[in-house]
Amino acid sequence: MEEGFRDRAAFIRGAKDIAKEVKKHAAKKVVKGLDRVQDEYSRRSYSRFEEEEDDDDFPAPADGYYRGEGAQDEEEGGASSDATEGHDEDDEIYEGEYQGIPRAESGGKGERMADGAPLAGVRGGLSDGEGPPGGRGEAQRRKDREELAQQYETILRECGHGRFQWTLYFVLGLALMADGVEVFVVGFVLPSAEKDMCLSDSNKGMLGLIVYLGMMVGAFLWGGLADRLGRRQCLLISLSVNSVFAFFSSFVQGYGTFLFCRLLSGVGIGGSIPIVFSYFSEFLAQEKRGEHLSWLCMFWMIGGVYAAAMAWAIIPHYGWSFQMGSAYQFHSWRVFVLVCAFPSVFAIGALTTQPESPRFFLENGKHDEAWMVLKQVHDTNMRAKGHPERVFSVTHIKTIHQEDELIEIQSDTGTWYQRWGVRALSLGGQVWGNFLSCFSPEYRRITLMMMGVWFTMSFSYYGLTVWFPDMIRHLQAVDYAARTKVFPGERVEHVTFNFTLENQIHRGGQYFNDKFIGLRLKSVSFEDSLFEECYFEDVTSSNTFFRNCTFINTVFYNTDLFEYKFVNSRLVNSTFLHNKEGCPLDVTGTGEGAYMVYFVSFLGTLAVLPGNIVSALLMDKIGRLRMLAGSSVLSCVSCFFLSFGNSESAMIALLCLFGGVSIASWNALDVLTVELYPSDKRTTAFGFLNALCKLAAVLGISIFTSFVGITKAAPILFASAALALGSSLALKLPETRGQVLQ
């Protein structure tokens, strides 16, 4: 009996050993089956969606995640938990692996995990399309990117170029147009706003500076975020910030609040250029990219023309205003500020109908979302071309395994602002790390060279484009001063002045018992004169001064002759009653000078149209570097003609010439920046370079305008040297014509 029992026990143990070996081989076979199902490009596991012949014999576990030979075995007793106790010495797993989280140690089973299917839906682990940190070498990631770039280019060619790209072209063009408008808004409203807000010269300078400062911050901020959160989402947010604060700035009354609103408006629009060019380029095949990105640049010009035309049409109409007491005034220049927010608002509405960049989806492991967008591009273009029957044949697309560590905060962890703070810090760290990677050994030389090109181009371009109008105003002032009439030693008694005096100098005059009622004084100076028993009522003045004058028994009623207009003058027994309210500063207001600002800006922006057309047609034929260097050399040569600009018309002509030849270099620089950096760094690098561009613009404007009225040699020398240096640096960059988008 005992011998039979021992035989039976030995038989049971042998059967268990056989069953155990069978299950091990079954698990290996299932893994091999899943490897066949796994997409060659996306490395996603489709075990939940596709059936194989092996599944009937070897059903997969419920969670569907396999890690090589480390598959789970059922416990012999069946009562223990597989997650905690269901393993033996030969087939060891740990609890986290059962939940889909890979082991931390490398080697053995870890090698299978490095090449295996990415994890999906894992809390606290890696997102879909991501590999374990450090599990894939940089060489493998580079190889994956090259494969993705080649496949993505092939897919774009299959999708074709048609209605979808042209629709996106006009949508993104509105966003770029909003950036062009923003640059001109402050300059156009200053002649009118300076009186309403009582702006001193330092206040006006700060207002012009704050716009560039906001755009500099916005370019870096939104450019970095767009590589992490998506092009479309960040562009929508940035345009929303711009439109909201541009709207507020048209209603606020104080200088401080207006300055704050324009700062945040600039921060919002700063993300437009780096995101728009990156976004559009990722829908363009290689043979179309250079040309159509250059066509897109035309909308920046349209923005400048729109701003100049609206300023010309709106600001001089003083009837387009209302006033609520003396505290709230809404003049025509505020209507202009409001109208300038329209391109941004329209861009937001149109952008909501467009999809996210499929290249961004693929870079972040979102295969299905990218496939849907590319199918939309294909179907839209095929229907427009009359081929609705054509089917999008792509089934699998390569995705990049991410190495960034993701952080997920449970809903019961701390307060809501603590969770948001942790997420913000995590996102900020990722953005900063991505920015620093632009200076890695692989990209350091390109980044430093591009910094030099962007800085020199911006320094010379913005410096000269602001210097031109200032020089025109200086020439106007010189011509105006040459027509000044001088009245020496006049004696006037018992006369009533009720008309306008303009551009006059009265020296050594004597005025006895005269009345100045309803008088308008513009650029009038009284020097060494005597006023006795005179009466001033309802007098308005601009650029008017009394120097070394004496007033005896004189009354001033309802005038704007404030104390600072009396220079070294004596007032004896004189009275000021009910001085005019408003700004006590001497401002020029609107007039012929303001019209000239609009006109010059209109011509200057319109003059770049021929250069835009030429650069778009030749960009893919002669290459980016030749276009950039050639345009820079022509711009450098055009600077030497500035020495012949001794009249107003000559300076306007030279401004148009410089703008027309320099725009091609900007178009080439935008295309080159897009193509030199990979998709995961594209908007980050573009945003940083654009921020550097705004810094160089501030320096160029400050330096160039300081020489107005002193010499023209210094601006010519600085601009020529900067352009020559930029063109020489550009020739050392790699040519990107004919290359697929990284």
Swiss-Prot record:
GO cellular component: cell-cell junction; dendrite; GABA-ergic synapse; glutamatergic synapse; neuromuscular junction; neuron projection; neuronal cell body; presynaptic active zone
Bilayer topology term: Multi-pass membrane protein
Keywords attached to this entry: Cell projection, Cytoplasmic vesicle, Glycoprotein, Membrane, Neurotransmitter transport, Phosphoprotein, Receptor, Synapse, Transmembrane, Transmembrane helix, Transport
Outcome (variant: N498Q): No change in uptake of BoNT/E or C.botulinum neurotoxin type A (BoNT/A, botA) by mouse SV2A/SV2B knockout neurons; SV2A apparent molecular weight decreases. No change in uptake of BoNT/E. No change in uptake of BoNT/D
Gene Ontology biological-process entries: intracellular calcium ion homeostasis; neurotransmitter transport; regulation of gamma-aminobutyric acid secretion; synaptic vesicle priming
GO function term, MF aspect, one: transmembrane transporter activity
Record Gene3D superfamilies: E3 ubiquitin-protein ligase SopA, MFS general substrate transporter like domains
Cytoplasmic topology ranges: 1-169, 227-233, 284-294, 356-447, 620-626, 673-685, 732-742
Main location: other
Extracellular-facing ranges: 191-205, 255-262, 316-334, 469-598, 648-651, 709-712
Modification sites for Phosphotyrosine: Y480
Sequence positions bearing Phosphoserine: S80, S81, S127, S393
Modification after translation (UniProt): Phosphorylation by CK1 of the N-terminal cytoplasmic domain regulates interaction with SYT1. N-glycosylated, on at least 3 residues.
Glycosylation sites: N498, N548, N573
Compositionally biased residues, Basic and acidic residues: 40-49
Assembly and binders: Interacts with SYT1/synaptotagmin-1 in a calcium-dependent manner. Binds the adapter protein complex AP-2. (Microbial infection) Interacts with C.botulinum neurotoxin type A1 and type A2 (BoNT/A, botA). Interaction is improved by glycosylation of SV2.
Keyword Plastid: no
Further remark: Identified as the brain binding-site for the antiepileptic drug levetiracetam/lev.
Region entry Interaction with SYT1, spans: 1-57
Residue numbers spanned by region Disordered: 40-145
Domain of life: Eukaryota
UniProt entry tagged with the keyword Transport: yes
Knockout mutant characteristics: Short hairpin-mediated RNA knockdown of the protein in PC12 cells leads to increased resistance to C.botulinum neurotoxin type A (BoNT/A, botA) as assayed by reduced SNAP25 cleavage; uptake and degradation are restored by expression of SV2B or SV2C.
Function: Plays a role in the control of regulated secretion in neural and endocrine cells, enhancing selectively low-frequency neurotransmission. Positively regulates vesicle fusion by maintaining the readily releasable pool of secretory vesicles. (Microbial infection) Receptor for C.botulinum neurotoxin type A (BoNT/A, botA); the toxin binds via extracellular loop 4. Restores uptake of BoNT/A in mouse cells that are deleted for SV2 receptor. Glycosylation of Asn-573 is not essential for receptor activity, but enhances uptake. Also serves as a receptor for the closely related C.botulinum neurotoxin type A2; glycosylation is not essential but enhances the interaction.
Organism: Rattus norvegicus
Name this polypeptide is given: Synaptic vesicle glycoprotein 2A
